Amino acid sequence: MQEVKAFNEKRAEIYWWFSSLFAKELSEKELETYHSVEIRSFLAGLGENESLKPAVDSLVDALNRLQDRNDAQLELAADFCELFLKTDKYGALPYASMYIGESGLLNDKPAEEMEKLMADFGVQVDENLKEPADHLAVELDFLGNMIIRSNELEQEKHMEEAFVKQNDFIQNQLMSWLPKFAEKCKQFDEFGFYLSVAQLLIAFCKLDSAYLLGE
């Protein structure tokens, strides 16, 4: 059980890391850490899994190209703004409602469902994420909290039940729209940093789902 809980902590940290990338632009200082040995080792570790390797390689390639980009932080911040903060017509808005909602507008049914899930779990999401509940960063932050909450359980059968709920969340709240989101990133993210992050997130969700199902 202790091994499972230790692995849960790693899983939660990875989802929180993804959440941070979709929550806001990277600062100059944050971007510098992506060229550090620590982050590169973390990415290399993820890339040791064959199912994650292509997306990790794309992300590392984008990071390497960033080092040759003039005003890299400003350019990447502009990419973030163009992709995630402007219009659905020319970007990839990171809200589930834009992909699986009925109206094609923000704050549709997916946002309501997320609000209910959060209330039912009694899980607080990072208060700095001032976004509708179906924003990708909010959903990933919530999933990390779900995983950590399960570490309070002591019986194996209860952990198995928690795994079922986590997998349901991945399938229903994330994989139901992430592929469409990634397609939009592919269409509009010319440099490819955020596209590679989206592709890595999808690959990780698939891998994590297989783990939760015991495959």
Swiss-Prot record:
Keyword Chaperone annotated: yes
Keywords from the UniProt entry: Chaperone, Cytoplasm
GO BP terms: protein complex oligomerization; protein folding
Main location, first listed in the record: cytoplasm
Keyword Transport annotated: no
Subcellular location: Cytoplasm
GO cellular component, one term: cytoplasm
SUPFAM superfamilies: TorD-like
Gene3D superfamilies noted in UniProt: 1.20.120.1820, HscB, C-terminal domain
Coiled-coil stretches: none
Classification via NCBIfam families: PRK04976.1
Family: Belongs to the TorD/DmsD family. TorD subfamily.
Function recorded in the entry: Involved in the biogenesis of TorA. Acts on TorA before the insertion of the molybdenum cofactor and, as a result, probably favors a conformation of the apoenzyme that is competent for acquiring the cofactor.
Name used for this protein in its record: Chaperone protein TorD
